[in-house]
């Protein structure tokens, strides 16, 4: 018997269209990673004459990529990630995961504006590895 392996890819536009299509047709909200898998599975089924079934398992929350998902559904650009979370929830009637929705009230633990030269970064990594 021969074994075959198929590989596909999806552009950002195709990924966004898949998010919108799945939501429109099934009222199911998917994240971009799942959308790539669904898009590629659809392409496989279009190309290959098979009676095989495909199961796409979604493990990521669409709210982790709320800006991409919301823009895919509405085409609207908003100010920040928290606004996208709120807007995605309002648009779809879904509830964001509590750990994500509570982020806005959490204390910032790390300074996001640190900058290191490559040699300083290498020194930090070596020191941490000791």
Task: Mark where each language-model region is.
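PLP-dependent amino-acid enzyme catalytic core
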Residues: 1-130
């Amino acid at each position: 018997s021969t074994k075959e392996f198929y590989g596909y890819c999806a552009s950002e536009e195709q990924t966004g269209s898949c998010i919108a299509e799945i939501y429109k047709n099934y009222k199911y909200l998917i994240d971009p990673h799942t959308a790539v898998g669904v898009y590629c599975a659809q392409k496989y089924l279009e190309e290959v004459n098979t009676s095989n079934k495909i199961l796409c398992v979604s493990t990521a929350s669409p709210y982790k990529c709320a800006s991409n998902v919301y823009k895919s559904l509405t085409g609207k650009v908003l100010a920040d990630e928290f606004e996208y979370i709120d807007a995605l929830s309002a648009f779809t009637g879904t509830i964001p995961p509590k750990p994500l929705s509570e982020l806005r009230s959490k204390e910032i633990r790390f300074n996001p504006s640190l900058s290191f030269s490559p040699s300083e970064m290498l020194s930090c990594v070596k020191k941490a590895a000791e």
